[in-house]
Protein backbone atom coordinates (compact mmCIF):
# COMPACT_ATOMS: atom_id res chain seq x y z
CA UNK A 1 0.00 0.00 0.00
CA UNK A 2 2.83 2.41 0.82
CA UNK A 3 4.22 1.94 -2.71
CA UNK A 4 0.84 2.73 -4.26
CA UNK A 5 0.50 5.86 -2.13
CA UNK A 6 3.98 6.94 -3.15
CA UNK A 7 3.14 6.43 -6.81
CA UNK A 8 -0.09 8.39 -6.42
CA UNK A 9 1.61 11.29 -4.67
CA UNK A 10 4.32 11.47 -7.30
CA UNK A 11 1.72 11.34 -10.07
CA UNK A 12 -0.22 14.18 -8.45
CA UNK A 13 2.94 16.22 -8.20
CA UNK A 14 3.62 15.64 -11.88
CA UNK A 15 0.06 16.57 -12.81
CA UNK A 16 0.52 19.80 -10.91
CA UNK A 17 3.42 20.61 -13.18
CA UNK A 18 4.69 18.19 -15.78
CA UNK A 19 6.25 18.75 -19.17
CA UNK A 20 5.13 17.08 -22.33
CA UNK A 21 6.39 16.55 -25.86
CA UNK A 22 8.92 18.74 -27.58
CA UNK A 23 11.31 18.89 -30.50
CA UNK A 24 13.68 21.55 -31.98
CA UNK A 25 14.05 24.61 -29.79
CA UNK A 26 15.46 28.05 -30.60
CA UNK A 27 16.59 29.99 -27.52
CA UNK A 28 17.44 33.22 -29.24
CA UNK A 29 15.68 36.52 -28.75
CA UNK A 30 17.23 38.10 -31.87
CA UNK A 31 16.14 41.69 -32.24
CA UNK A 32 14.72 43.60 -29.30
CA UNK A 33 11.34 43.75 -31.03
CA UNK A 34 9.42 41.67 -33.49
CA UNK A 35 9.77 42.59 -37.17
CA UNK A 36 6.87 44.77 -38.39
CA UNK A 37 4.99 43.18 -41.30
CA UNK A 38 1.74 44.02 -43.09
CA UNK A 39 -0.47 41.19 -44.31
CA UNK A 40 -3.00 43.04 -46.43
CA UNK A 41 -6.54 41.60 -46.65
CA UNK A 42 -6.57 39.36 -49.72
CA UNK A 43 -8.74 40.37 -52.64
CA UNK A 44 -11.54 37.99 -53.63
CA UNK A 45 -12.96 37.80 -57.13
CA UNK A 46 -16.17 36.05 -56.13
CA UNK A 47 -19.69 36.91 -55.07
CA UNK A 48 -20.00 35.08 -51.75
CA UNK A 49 -18.26 35.87 -48.48
CA UNK A 50 -15.53 33.34 -47.72
CA UNK A 51 -15.81 31.39 -44.43
CA UNK A 52 -12.18 32.10 -43.50
CA UNK A 53 -10.07 35.27 -43.55
CA UNK A 54 -6.80 34.08 -45.06
CA UNK A 55 -4.77 37.20 -44.35
CA UNK A 56 -5.86 37.15 -40.71
CA UNK A 57 -4.78 33.51 -40.33
CA UNK A 58 -1.42 34.21 -41.99
CA UNK A 59 -0.86 37.26 -39.81
CA UNK A 60 -1.70 35.33 -36.65
CA UNK A 61 0.67 32.53 -37.65
CA UNK A 62 3.55 34.94 -38.17
CA UNK A 63 2.75 36.73 -34.91
CA UNK A 64 2.60 33.47 -32.95
CA UNK A 65 6.18 32.68 -33.93
CA UNK A 66 7.36 35.71 -31.97
CA UNK A 67 9.41 36.89 -34.94
CA UNK A 68 6.87 39.23 -36.55
CA UNK A 69 4.36 41.88 -35.50
CA UNK A 70 1.49 42.27 -38.01
CA UNK A 71 0.26 45.80 -38.67
CA UNK A 72 -3.37 46.37 -37.60
CA UNK A 73 -5.62 46.83 -40.62
CA UNK A 74 -6.86 50.19 -39.43
CA UNK A 75 -3.29 51.48 -39.71
CA UNK A 76 -2.94 50.53 -43.38
CA UNK A 77 -2.89 53.55 -45.68
CA UNK A 78 -3.74 51.40 -48.70
CA UNK A 79 -4.90 47.82 -49.22
CA UNK A 80 -3.54 46.49 -52.52
CA UNK A 81 -4.51 43.01 -53.74
CA UNK A 82 -2.03 42.81 -56.63
CA UNK A 83 1.74 43.19 -56.72
CA UNK A 84 1.40 46.03 -59.21
CA UNK A 85 -0.74 47.99 -56.73
CA UNK A 86 1.86 48.13 -53.94
CA UNK A 87 2.92 51.72 -53.16
CA UNK A 88 6.07 51.41 -51.07
CA UNK A 89 5.92 54.90 -49.59
CA UNK A 90 2.63 53.94 -47.90
CA UNK A 91 4.37 51.08 -46.10
CA UNK A 92 7.48 53.05 -45.28
CA UNK A 93 5.23 55.68 -43.71
CA UNK A 94 3.73 53.15 -41.28
CA UNK A 95 7.11 51.59 -40.47
CA UNK A 96 6.78 48.01 -41.69
CA UNK A 97 9.69 45.99 -43.07
CA UNK A 98 7.63 43.66 -45.23
CA UNK A 99 4.23 43.67 -46.94
CA UNK A 100 2.24 40.72 -48.26
CA UNK A 101 -0.58 40.97 -50.78
CA UNK A 102 -2.82 38.27 -52.21
CA UNK A 103 -5.74 37.63 -54.49
CA UNK A 104 -8.27 34.77 -54.39
CA UNK A 105 -9.82 33.74 -57.72
CA UNK A 106 -12.51 31.05 -58.22
CA UNK A 107 -11.27 28.49 -60.76
CA UNK A 108 -13.34 25.48 -61.81
CA UNK A 109 -15.13 25.07 -58.49
CA UNK A 110 -11.93 25.62 -56.54
CA UNK A 111 -10.01 28.65 -55.33
CA UNK A 112 -6.66 29.79 -56.68
CA UNK A 113 -4.70 31.99 -54.29
CA UNK A 114 -1.89 34.15 -55.68
CA UNK A 115 0.36 35.88 -53.18
CA UNK A 116 3.48 38.03 -53.12
CA UNK A 117 5.80 39.25 -50.37
CA UNK A 118 7.87 42.43 -50.62
CA UNK A 119 10.82 43.92 -48.78
CA UNK A 120 9.73 47.50 -48.16
CA UNK A 121 13.25 48.82 -47.63
CA UNK A 122 14.65 47.51 -50.92
CA UNK A 123 11.29 47.69 -52.73
CA UNK A 124 11.98 44.19 -54.05
CA UNK A 125 9.72 41.16 -54.28
CA UNK A 126 11.18 38.38 -52.13
CA UNK A 127 8.53 35.68 -52.56
CA UNK A 128 5.68 34.92 -54.91
CA UNK A 129 3.53 31.85 -55.28
CA UNK A 130 0.18 30.30 -56.04
CA UNK A 131 -1.78 27.59 -54.27
CA UNK A 132 -5.12 26.00 -55.18
CA UNK A 133 -7.68 24.30 -52.98
CA UNK A 134 -11.32 24.04 -51.99
CA UNK A 135 -13.21 26.39 -49.71
CA UNK A 136 -12.75 23.84 -46.93
CA UNK A 137 -8.98 24.14 -47.39
CA UNK A 138 -8.71 27.90 -46.85
CA UNK A 139 -7.01 27.38 -43.48
CA UNK A 140 -4.63 24.81 -44.96
CA UNK A 141 -3.68 27.21 -47.74
CA UNK A 142 -3.24 30.03 -45.23
CA UNK A 143 -0.92 27.96 -43.03
CA UNK A 144 1.01 26.90 -46.15
CA UNK A 145 1.57 30.50 -47.24
CA UNK A 146 2.64 31.42 -43.70
CA UNK A 147 5.09 28.48 -43.71
CA UNK A 148 6.60 29.59 -47.03
CA UNK A 149 6.87 33.22 -45.92
CA UNK A 150 8.37 32.38 -42.54
CA UNK A 151 11.04 30.14 -44.05
CA UNK A 152 11.91 32.72 -46.71
CA UNK A 153 12.38 35.49 -44.15
CA UNK A 154 14.03 33.55 -41.32
CA UNK A 155 15.63 30.49 -42.88
CA UNK A 156 13.63 28.34 -40.43
CA UNK A 157 11.10 25.84 -41.73
CA UNK A 158 7.57 26.95 -40.87
CA UNK A 159 5.48 24.80 -38.52
CA UNK A 160 2.05 26.36 -39.00
CA UNK A 161 0.69 23.39 -40.98
CA UNK A 162 1.27 21.01 -38.07
CA UNK A 163 -1.37 19.51 -35.78
CA UNK A 164 -1.93 19.17 -32.06
CA UNK A 165 -3.41 16.50 -29.80
CA UNK A 166 -5.11 17.33 -26.52
CA UNK A 167 -7.58 15.86 -24.06
CA UNK A 168 -10.79 17.45 -22.81
CA UNK A 169 -12.68 16.51 -19.66
CA UNK A 170 -16.27 17.74 -19.42
CA UNK A 171 -17.95 17.02 -16.09
CA UNK A 172 -21.75 16.69 -16.04
CA UNK A 173 -22.13 15.33 -12.50
CA UNK A 174 -20.07 13.78 -9.72
CA UNK A 175 -19.84 10.40 -11.45
CA UNK A 176 -20.36 11.48 -15.05
CA UNK A 177 -17.37 12.93 -16.91
CA UNK A 178 -16.79 12.71 -20.64
CA UNK A 179 -13.19 12.55 -21.88
CA UNK A 180 -12.28 13.17 -25.49
CA UNK A 181 -9.03 12.95 -27.40
CA UNK A 182 -8.94 15.75 -29.95
CA UNK A 183 -6.76 16.51 -32.97
CA UNK A 184 -6.72 20.10 -34.21
CA UNK A 185 -4.65 22.61 -36.11
CA UNK A 186 -1.68 23.80 -34.05
CA UNK A 187 -3.67 26.92 -33.12
CA UNK A 188 -6.67 24.98 -31.80
CA UNK A 189 -8.86 25.44 -34.88
CA UNK A 190 -10.84 22.63 -36.54
CA UNK A 191 -10.84 20.08 -33.70
CA UNK A 192 -11.73 16.49 -34.59
CA UNK A 193 -12.62 13.88 -31.97
CA UNK A 194 -10.44 10.77 -32.24
CA UNK A 195 -11.68 8.99 -29.12
CA UNK A 196 -14.43 9.50 -26.55
CA UNK A 197 -14.64 7.73 -23.19
CA UNK A 198 -16.24 7.87 -19.76
CA UNK A 199 -12.82 7.05 -18.32
CA UNK A 200 -9.66 9.20 -18.34
CA UNK A 201 -7.37 9.48 -21.37
CA UNK A 202 -3.82 10.69 -20.70
CA UNK A 203 -0.38 11.10 -22.28
CA UNK A 204 -1.20 11.24 -26.01
CA UNK A 205 1.89 11.16 -28.24
CA UNK A 206 2.41 11.30 -31.99
CA UNK A 207 4.61 8.80 -33.78
CA UNK A 208 7.55 10.33 -35.70
CA UNK A 209 5.58 10.21 -38.98
CA UNK A 210 2.40 11.58 -37.39
CA UNK A 211 0.29 8.66 -38.62
CA UNK A 212 -0.11 6.93 -35.25
CA UNK A 213 -0.72 8.10 -31.73
CA UNK A 214 -0.02 6.35 -28.44
CA UNK A 215 -1.98 7.14 -25.30
CA UNK A 216 -3.08 5.74 -21.96
CA UNK A 217 -6.74 4.85 -21.52
CA UNK A 218 -8.55 3.86 -18.33
CA UNK A 219 -11.49 2.34 -20.23
CA UNK A 220 -10.81 -1.04 -18.59
CA UNK A 221 -10.84 0.67 -15.17
CA UNK A 222 -7.05 0.52 -15.08
CA UNK A 223 -4.36 2.24 -17.16
CA UNK A 224 -3.48 0.52 -20.42
CA UNK A 225 -1.49 1.79 -23.42
CA UNK A 226 -3.06 1.88 -26.88
CA UNK A 227 -1.82 2.84 -30.33
CA UNK A 228 -4.35 4.32 -32.73
CA UNK A 229 -4.02 5.08 -36.45
CA UNK A 230 -5.05 8.67 -37.08
CA UNK A 231 -6.60 8.20 -40.54
CA UNK A 232 -8.58 5.00 -39.94
CA UNK A 233 -9.17 5.07 -36.19
CA UNK A 234 -7.95 1.47 -35.88
CA UNK A 235 -6.66 0.75 -32.36
CA UNK A 236 -4.26 -1.77 -30.86
CA UNK A 237 -3.86 -2.44 -27.15
CA UNK A 238 -0.13 -2.52 -26.47
CA UNK A 239 0.06 -3.30 -22.74
CA UNK A 240 -1.96 -5.29 -20.25
CA UNK A 241 0.38 -5.59 -17.29
CA UNK A 242 -0.49 -5.46 -13.62
CA UNK A 243 -0.23 -2.05 -12.00
CA UNK A 244 0.78 1.15 -13.72
CA UNK A 245 1.03 1.23 -17.54
CA UNK A 246 1.89 4.77 -18.61
CA UNK A 247 3.93 7.52 -20.29
CA UNK A 248 4.36 6.07 -23.80
CA UNK A 249 7.04 7.55 -26.08
CA UNK A 250 7.85 6.46 -29.64
CA UNK A 251 11.49 5.96 -30.55
CA UNK A 252 12.84 8.22 -33.34
CA UNK A 253 12.41 5.45 -35.93
CA UNK A 254 8.89 4.65 -34.70
CA UNK A 255 9.71 0.96 -34.23
CA UNK A 256 9.95 0.95 -30.43
CA UNK A 257 7.84 2.32 -27.63
CA UNK A 258 9.23 3.30 -24.24
CA UNK A 259 6.80 3.40 -21.32
CA UNK A 260 6.49 2.95 -17.57
CA UNK A 261 5.36 -0.22 -15.79
CA UNK A 262 5.05 -1.06 -12.10
CA UNK A 263 4.67 -4.80 -12.74
CA UNK A 264 7.76 -5.55 -10.64
CA UNK A 265 6.88 -3.21 -7.78
CA UNK A 266 7.81 0.43 -8.25
CA UNK A 267 7.54 2.27 -11.59
CA UNK A 268 10.39 1.48 -13.97
CA UNK A 269 11.01 2.31 -17.62
CA UNK A 270 10.69 -0.41 -20.24
CA UNK A 271 11.00 -0.48 -24.01
CA UNK A 272 8.99 -2.66 -26.39
CA UNK A 273 9.83 -3.62 -29.95
CA UNK A 274 6.51 -2.95 -31.69
CA UNK A 275 7.16 -5.60 -34.33
CA UNK A 276 8.01 -8.55 -32.11
CA UNK A 277 6.45 -7.18 -28.89
CA UNK A 278 9.68 -8.11 -27.10
CA UNK A 279 9.93 -6.25 -23.78
CA UNK A 280 13.10 -5.02 -22.11
CA UNK A 281 13.48 -3.34 -18.73
CA UNK A 282 15.78 -0.30 -18.82
CA UNK A 283 15.85 1.10 -15.27
CA UNK A 284 16.29 -0.75 -12.00
CA UNK A 285 16.05 1.50 -8.98
CA UNK A 286 14.05 1.66 -5.75
CA UNK A 287 12.91 5.16 -6.72
CA UNK A 288 10.21 6.09 -9.22
CA UNK A 289 11.49 6.29 -12.81
CA UNK A 290 9.04 7.74 -15.31
CA UNK A 291 8.36 10.05 -18.29
CA UNK A 292 10.86 8.73 -20.86
CA UNK A 293 11.87 10.85 -23.84
CA UNK A 294 14.17 9.63 -26.61
CA UNK A 295 17.27 11.35 -27.89
CA UNK A 296 17.38 11.53 -31.67
CA UNK A 297 20.07 8.84 -31.92
CA UNK A 298 17.67 6.27 -30.45
CA UNK A 299 20.23 5.17 -27.86
CA UNK A 300 19.77 7.94 -25.27
CA UNK A 301 16.74 8.22 -23.02
CA UNK A 302 15.94 11.15 -20.74
CA UNK A 303 13.59 10.48 -17.83
CA UNK A 304 12.30 11.77 -14.49
CA UNK A 305 13.33 10.10 -11.24
CA UNK A 306 13.14 10.88 -7.53
CA UNK A 307 16.16 8.68 -6.81
CA UNK A 308 17.93 11.75 -5.39
CA UNK A 309 15.03 12.51 -3.02
CA UNK A 310 13.09 14.91 -5.28
CA UNK A 311 12.06 14.70 -8.94
CA UNK A 312 14.98 15.52 -11.23
CA UNK A 313 15.90 14.67 -14.81
CA UNK A 314 18.42 11.99 -15.74
CA UNK A 315 19.68 10.51 -18.98
CA UNK A 316 20.50 6.91 -19.75
CA UNK A 317 22.51 5.17 -22.43
CA UNK A 318 20.05 2.50 -23.52
CA UNK A 319 22.84 0.18 -24.66
CA UNK A 320 25.15 0.36 -21.63
CA UNK A 321 22.62 1.29 -18.95
CA UNK A 322 24.81 4.17 -17.70
CA UNK A 323 22.79 6.94 -15.99
CA UNK A 324 23.76 10.59 -15.38
CA UNK A 325 21.84 13.35 -13.62
CA UNK A 326 21.09 16.34 -15.87
CA UNK A 327 19.22 18.94 -13.78
CA UNK A 328 20.47 20.58 -10.58
CA UNK A 329 18.72 23.99 -10.53
CA UNK A 330 15.49 24.03 -8.50
CA UNK A 331 13.92 21.41 -6.26
CA UNK A 332 11.61 19.97 -8.92
CA UNK A 333 12.32 19.24 -12.58
CA UNK A 334 10.19 16.74 -14.47
CA UNK A 335 8.93 15.45 -17.82
CA UNK A 336 11.98 16.17 -20.00
CA UNK A 337 11.83 17.08 -23.67
CA UNK A 338 14.91 17.58 -25.81
CA UNK A 339 15.43 20.03 -28.66
CA UNK A 340 16.30 18.67 -32.10
CA UNK A 341 19.84 19.99 -31.86
CA UNK A 342 20.06 18.33 -28.42
CA UNK A 343 21.35 21.54 -26.86
CA UNK A 344 18.23 22.48 -24.88
CA UNK A 345 16.08 20.60 -22.40
CA UNK A 346 12.47 21.70 -21.76
CA UNK A 347 10.79 20.70 -18.51
CA UNK A 348 8.39 21.57 -15.72
CA UNK A 349 10.40 23.44 -13.11
CA UNK A 350 9.95 24.69 -9.57
CA UNK A 351 12.45 27.10 -8.10
CA UNK A 352 13.85 26.56 -4.63
CA UNK A 353 11.59 28.19 -2.05
CA UNK A 354 8.64 28.62 -4.43
CA UNK A 355 5.41 26.67 -4.87
CA UNK A 356 4.71 27.56 -8.51
CA UNK A 357 5.28 25.03 -11.28
CA UNK A 358 6.41 26.69 -14.52
CA UNK A 359 7.82 25.71 -17.88
CA UNK A 360 11.57 26.19 -18.23
CA UNK A 361 14.38 25.50 -20.69
CA UNK A 362 17.92 24.54 -19.73
CA UNK A 363 20.93 25.12 -21.98
CA UNK A 364 22.72 21.77 -21.80
CA UNK A 365 26.06 23.28 -22.83
CA UNK A 366 26.15 26.31 -20.52
CA UNK A 367 23.93 24.92 -17.77
CA UNK A 368 21.79 28.05 -17.41
CA UNK A 369 18.02 27.75 -17.04
CA UNK A 370 15.32 30.12 -18.29
CA UNK A 371 11.65 30.17 -17.23
CA UNK A 372 9.41 30.44 -20.31
CA UNK A 373 5.91 30.73 -18.83
CA UNK A 374 4.46 33.47 -16.64
CA UNK A 375 1.55 31.46 -15.22
CA UNK A 376 1.42 28.95 -12.35
CA UNK A 377 0.46 25.28 -12.08
CA UNK A 378 1.83 24.85 -15.60
CA UNK A 379 1.88 21.41 -17.16
CA UNK A 380 2.60 19.44 -20.32
CA UNK A 381 4.72 21.73 -22.51
CA UNK A 382 5.00 20.65 -26.12
CA UNK A 383 7.25 22.37 -28.63
CA UNK A 384 6.72 23.01 -32.34
CA UNK A 385 8.99 20.95 -34.59
CA UNK A 386 10.88 24.09 -35.61
CA UNK A 387 11.32 25.19 -31.99
CA UNK A 388 9.81 28.66 -32.28
CA UNK A 389 6.61 28.10 -30.28
CA UNK A 390 5.52 26.26 -27.17
CA UNK A 391 2.07 25.11 -26.05
CA UNK A 392 1.39 24.07 -22.47
CA UNK A 393 -1.53 23.39 -20.15
CA UNK A 394 -2.34 25.58 -17.19
CA UNK A 395 -5.35 26.69 -15.16
CA UNK A 396 -7.28 29.94 -15.45
CA UNK A 397 -10.48 30.75 -13.57
CA UNK A 398 -10.55 27.19 -12.20
CA UNK A 399 -10.49 25.67 -15.69
CA UNK A 400 -7.81 23.83 -17.62
CA UNK A 401 -6.70 25.82 -20.67
CA UNK A 402 -3.92 25.75 -23.25
CA UNK A 403 -1.46 28.60 -23.72
CA UNK A 404 0.78 29.34 -26.70
CA UNK A 405 4.11 31.01 -26.01
CA UNK A 406 6.79 32.01 -28.48
CA UNK A 407 10.15 30.68 -27.37
CA UNK A 408 11.64 34.17 -27.52
CA UNK A 409 8.99 35.26 -25.00
CA UNK A 410 7.32 37.95 -27.12
CA UNK A 411 3.95 36.22 -27.50
CA UNK A 412 1.72 34.63 -24.84
CA UNK A 413 -1.87 33.90 -25.84
CA UNK A 414 -4.61 31.43 -24.78
CA UNK A 415 -5.75 28.98 -27.45
CA UNK A 416 -9.43 28.55 -28.26
CA UNK A 417 -10.61 25.08 -27.25
CA UNK A 418 -13.79 23.22 -26.34
CA UNK A 419 -15.75 23.37 -23.13
CA UNK A 420 -14.51 21.70 -19.98
CA UNK A 421 -10.97 21.17 -18.77
CA UNK A 422 -8.37 21.04 -21.53
CA UNK A 423 -5.08 19.28 -20.87
CA UNK A 424 -2.28 17.07 -22.21
CA UNK A 425 -1.30 18.93 -25.42
CA UNK A 426 1.09 17.20 -27.82
CA UNK A 427 2.51 18.87 -30.96
CA UNK A 428 2.82 16.82 -34.13
CA UNK A 429 5.97 16.41 -36.18
CA UNK A 430 6.09 17.93 -39.66
CA UNK A 431 3.34 16.32 -41.74
CA UNK A 432 3.23 15.53 -45.46
From Swiss-Prot:
Keyword NAD among UniProt keywords: no
Gene Ontology biological-process annotations: cell division; protein import
Main location, first listed in the record: periplasm
Alphabetical keyword list: Cell cycle, Cell division, Periplasm, Signal
Secretion signal, residue range per the UniProt entry: 1-21
Compartments where located: Periplasm
InterPro entries named among the record's database cross-references: 6-blade_b-propeller_TolB-like, PD40, Tol-Pal_TolB, TolB_N
Coiled coil: none
Pfam assignment, any one: TolB_N
Gene3D superfamilies linked: TolB, C-terminal domain, TolB, N-terminal domain
GO CC aspect terms: periplasmic space
Entry similarity comment: Belongs to the TolB family.
Main function: Part of the Tol-Pal system, which plays a role in outer membrane invagination during cell division and is important for maintaining outer membrane integrity.
Quaternary structure, from the entry: The Tol-Pal system is composed of five core proteins: the inner membrane proteins TolA, TolQ and TolR, the periplasmic protein TolB and the outer membrane protein Pal. They form a network linking the inner and outer membranes and the peptidoglycan layer.
NCBIfam families to which the protein is assigned, alphabetical: propeller_TolB (TIGR02800)
Name of the protein in its database record: Tol-Pal system protein TolB
Organism: Pseudomonas aeruginosa (strain ATCC 15692 / DSM 22644 / CIP 104116 / JCM 14847 / LMG 12228 / 1C / PRS 101 / PAO1)
Amino acid sequence: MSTLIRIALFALALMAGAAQAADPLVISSGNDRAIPIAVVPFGFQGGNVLPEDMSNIIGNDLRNSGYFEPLPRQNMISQPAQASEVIFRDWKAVGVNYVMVGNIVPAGGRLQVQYALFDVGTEQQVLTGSVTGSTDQLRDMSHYIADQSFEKLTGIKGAFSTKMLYVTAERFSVDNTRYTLQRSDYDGARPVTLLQSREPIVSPRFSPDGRRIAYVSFEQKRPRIFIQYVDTGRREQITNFEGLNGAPAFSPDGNRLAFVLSRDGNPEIYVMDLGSRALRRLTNNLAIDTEPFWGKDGSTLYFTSDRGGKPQIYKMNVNSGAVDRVTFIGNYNANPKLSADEKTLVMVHRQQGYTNFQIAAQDLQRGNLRVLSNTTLDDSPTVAPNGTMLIYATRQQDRGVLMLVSINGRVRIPLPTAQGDVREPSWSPYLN
